[in-house]
Structures are given as structure tokens and as C-alpha cells.
């Protein structure tokens, strides 16, 4: 059924593109994602660099995880676990986690204190679970009130802390940019919006101890960095898979699965599904709903994560200077093209040759 649905989506999108004068859906998809300052060539160059220098680095972290777990061989099911004691969980009740978040933002900067006080005073954080509440977690913006709003379901896992860092990063940017009178400046491209959230995850690192016990603080810090690194090859794999699909819309479902299996060998060569038939036949991509619902929207996360790694290296050298740049990036919102925003903020473009190698060299010092 999933194969049948996706086949219809690919053919429909290809037909849309042809009616609009495109040879394939890909250029139309780029326009729909508002990519107005980079194109397929730049994305392909980014993926090439990831294959050359980032994949080997990520594979070394999988090997460290295998040794940490005490396994002779690590399978797909094993790699979801950080260490022999499982993955770190925060301490305290949901109310205490929210209070820790408030303390964190009060101490981080005057701007974040003002932001979080505004969120609390106006009840803009609906983060506690309750019966009949919808699942999920996200930040959205209420333009009539110039107010960010965060929705989540705290459940006692490290995901609760992720809400306090990642979603609050989105919300903080929305709060800072609220006074911009030009409405279109709020229409931020996804590759830019995710820099705000992913970078905040690193800027808040000195306060992780508020959410975890002493031992688990270090575990969470390492796990957070490891999983951010491990995501990059996967994100590129999702992107390259979609380019292949829309370049060859006539492919059968079986042929698409063969493409995925081939890409897994490039981006995640360690992968072993250990007898899970659905995944072994090349169907793992069907877990990624973006591929169905939001075509070509995934490399945005990779671009943003790489920029967040640049901020991490910067804050390790000079936290105040990195924070000043971050505030500037947030306030610029979408007033410039994405590549211009990076240049203005002092961040190297991930598309440029050598940037990803430099990022990996800095990350190697961390781990």
C-alpha cells in the first residue's frame, strides 16, 4: 500500500512539473522550498563532501558506541541505545523540568530572560501531557499577538530537554524578530530556521546539569553530540534518494528500494538490520514521512546542523562572540538570502569546499 501511494505521488508531482515546463519535479521542488540562492549543484557538492569526510567520522562514533555497549557486532536495534545503562533521562517532574528551563534562560542572557518571562507570563508553553491531548511537539507563531507558542508532551525522556532547547530556539528567534514591520521577513527558509533551534541546543549546553544528575549530564552531552553527527549522513541519504526518485519517476517500487539499499552502503556502511525483513529489502525510507509529505525537504536539516556545528566550535573559542553572531542571525530573520545571512553572521557556507572538513576537524577535538 505504501509503495502504491508513493508511486502515485511521484507520478503526480512529475506531471505537475511537466505542465509547468520542467523536465523533472526536482527544480519545481526547489522553488517550492524557496531555495533562491543555491541549487542542485551546491547540494550535490555538499553531499560529496559529506561522503568524503563526514561519513568516516560518523562511522567512528558508531564504533565507539559498539565498544561502549560491549558488543562484538552492533545491529540496527543496538545502535538506538547510547550505553549499557540505556539512554540518559532527566531528573524531576515535568514542572521541575520547565522550571529548570526558566532558570537556564534567565542566566543565559538578558534577551533570553525577557523571552522566557514573556512565554511564561502569557502561558505560551503547553508542554505537559494530558488525556486526549494530541501527540507531537512543535513551535508555531501567532502573528496577531506577535507571540511564539510551543506545544509538546513531556514524558520523562531526554526529549523533554530537547523541547526546552530546540523548540525554544525557534521560539526565541520568533520573539526577537516580532517587531520587524515587513511581514515577508518572517517567512524564513527551513535551512535557516533550523539553525536557530539546532544552535540553541549547543548554546544551552552549560546548563544541561539543571536537567540531569551529575553522571547523566555528561552522558546526555555526549549522546546529543553523537546523534547530531550521526544524523548528517542519514539526512544526505534521504536527500540523494529523493533526487534519484524524481530523476527517474518511471522506477518501480522494487527499483526504488534497490536505490535505497545502495545508498545505505555509502552513507551508513556499518548498518546491519539483523533479519528485519522490511528494512533488509530497502524499505527503511518509508519510515521517513517527509519523503511522502514534503518532497525534497530534508537537506535543510543537514545544512542547519552543519551551521550549528560551526557555532559550537565558535562558542568553544569565544562564547560571547558566538552568541552575538547568533543574536544577529536571529534578528535578521529572512531579510536576506540564506547564503547572505550566513556571510553577515560570520558563518562559513556548508556548500563551500573545505567547510565540512573544517567542521569535522573541530568535532574530532570534542569527541
Locate predicted features.
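Catalytic Zn2+-binding segment of zinc metalloproteases
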Residues: 169-183, 203
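Contiguous, non-catalytic segments that form substrate-binding/exosite surfaces or channel walls
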Residues: 1-149, 348
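Post-HExxH zinc-binding segment in Zn-dependent metallohydrolases
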Residues: 52-53, 177, 188-216, 224-225, ...
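C-terminal, non-catalytic "cap/extension" segments appended to globular domains
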Residues: 128, 164, 172, 199-202, ...
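Beta-strand segments within the central parallel beta-sheet cores of soluble alpha/beta enzyme folds
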Residues: 115-121, 185-186, 213-224, 255-257, ...
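Hydrophobic (often cysteine-bearing) scaffold residues that line and stabilize catalytic clefts
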Residues: 46, 50, 93, 97, ...
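Short alpha-helical catalytic segment bearing the HExxH-like zincin motif
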Residues: 159-167
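Glycine- and acidic
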Residues: 36-44, 79-90, 110, 145-158, ...
Amino acid at each position: 500500500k505504501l509503495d502504491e501511494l508513493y508511486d502515485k505521488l511521484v507520478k503526480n508531482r512529475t506531471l505537475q512539473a511537466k505542465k509547468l515546463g520542467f523536465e523533472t519535479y526536482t527544480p519545481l521542488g526547489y522553488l517550492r522550498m524557496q531555495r533562491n540562492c543555491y541549487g542542485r549543484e551546491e547540494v550535490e557538492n555538499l553531499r560529496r563532501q559529506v561522503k568524503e569526510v563526514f561519513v568516516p567520522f560518523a562511522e567512528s562514533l558508531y564504533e565507539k558506541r559498539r565498544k561502549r555497549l560491549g558488543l562484538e557486532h552492533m545491529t540496527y536495534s543496538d545502535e538506538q541505545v547510547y550505553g549499557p545503562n540505556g539512554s540518559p533521562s532527566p531528573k524531576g517532574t515535568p514542572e521541575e523540568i520547565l522550571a529548570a528551563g526558566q532558570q537556564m534562560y534567565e542566566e543565559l542572557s538578558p534577551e533570553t530572560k525577557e523571552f522566557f518571562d514573556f512565554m511564561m507570563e502569557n502561558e505560551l508553553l503547553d508542554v505537559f501531557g494530558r488525556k486526549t491531548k494530541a501527540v507531537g511537539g512543535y513551535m508555531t507563531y501567532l502573528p496577531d499577538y506577535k507571540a511564539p507558542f510551543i506545544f509538546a508532551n513531556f514524558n520523562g525522556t531526554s526529549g523533554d530537554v530537547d523541547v526546552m532547547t530546540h523548540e525554544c530556539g525557534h521560539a526565541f528567534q520568533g520573539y526577537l524578530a516580532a517587531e520587524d514591520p515587513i511581514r515577508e521577513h518572517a517567512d524564513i527558509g527551513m535551512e535557516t530556521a533550523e539553525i536557530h533551534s539546532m544552535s540553541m541546543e549547543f548554546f544551552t549546553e552549560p546548563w544541561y546539569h539543571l536537567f540531569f544528575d551529575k553522571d547523566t549530564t555528561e552522558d546526555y552531552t555526549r549522546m546529543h553530540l553523537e546523534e547530531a553527527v550521526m544524523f548528517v549522513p542519514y539526512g544526505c541519504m534521504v536527500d540523494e534518494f529523493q533526487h534519484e526518485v524524481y530523476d527517474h519517476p518511471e522506477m518501480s517500487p522494487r527499483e526504488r528500494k534497490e536505490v535505497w539499499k545502495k545508498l545505505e552502503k555509502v552513507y551508513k556502511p556499518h548498518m546491519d538490520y539483523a533479519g528485519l525483513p522490511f528494512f533488509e529489502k530497502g524499505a527503511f525510507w518509508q519510515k521517513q514521512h517527509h519523503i511522502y509529505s514534503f518532497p525534497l525537504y530534508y537537506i535543510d536539516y543537514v545544512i542547519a546542523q552543519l551551521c550549528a556545528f560551526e557555532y559550537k566550535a565558535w562558542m568553544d573559542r569565544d562564547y560571547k562572540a558566538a552568541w552575538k553572531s547568533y543574536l544577529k542571525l536571529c534578528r535578521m530573520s529572512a531579510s536576506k538570502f540564506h547564503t547572505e545571512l550566513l556571510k553577515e553572521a560570520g558563518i562559513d557556507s556548508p556548500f563551500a569546499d573545505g567547510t565540512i572538513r573544517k567542521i569535522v576537524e573541530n568535532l574530532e577535538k570534542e569527541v
